[in-house]
Amino acid sequence: VSGNMFASSSEPGIVWVMQDTNGNGLPDDEWYQLKGSEYGKPQTVEDYAVTYYRPSGAGMPVRWSDNRGGEGEVPYNNFHRQEFNYPQWIEAQSYTLYGVRLAPNTYTDTSTGNIINGAYEWGYADNYGSDRATGDNADGAAAKTLFDIDNAVNADGTPANLQYIDFVKVQTAINHATALLGEVSTEVLAMADETLR
C-alpha cells in the first residue's frame, strides 16, 4: 500500500482484507484486520464508532461525537480546495463510521517547534514504520508499506489463516486534528500485490 509518509508525518491507516468466500465477486464476506504493532494494546480501541454531523454552511468545521464520550470538530482549513469537509454524496444530516482507533502520536518538537505526526512501529498504511519498502522519503512522494496476509486476524484475535485476498480497504486509524495541519487522515496512493504469480 503506497502512501505519502515521511519521517515527521505518519497518518496511519488500518488495512482490512477479505476473501471472496461465496464467489459472487462482491465484498460481502467477512473483513479481517491486518494486525499492526498497536494491536491488543490497552490504548487501542477495537470497537470504535464516530458520528459526523453536516455543517450548517460552506467553509465550516464538521462536528463529531464518538462512542467513548468524545466530541470535537474536523477543522476547515484555508488550504482545502473543496467547500465542505462533509461528503457531498451523503444526504443524511449525520453518518457513523465503525472501526479501530489508535491513540494519537502527535507532538511538537521542542527544538524546532514543528508539529510531528509520529510513526507507529509497523503494520499501518501511510506510516513511516519499520515495514516501509522505500528509503527516507523526505519529500512525501509515494512510498510503499509492505503487508502480510498472515497478520489477518478474526474478531477474537485468532489467526484468520487466509490463503489469498480479493478485496482490500484502508481505514484511517486516528481521530485527531491540529490547528495548523488539520485532521490526521490516511492517504492511499496505490495498492499492489507484490507476490502475484
Residue ranges and their predicted role:
Residues 37-138:
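Low-complexity, serine/threonine/proline-enriched polar segments
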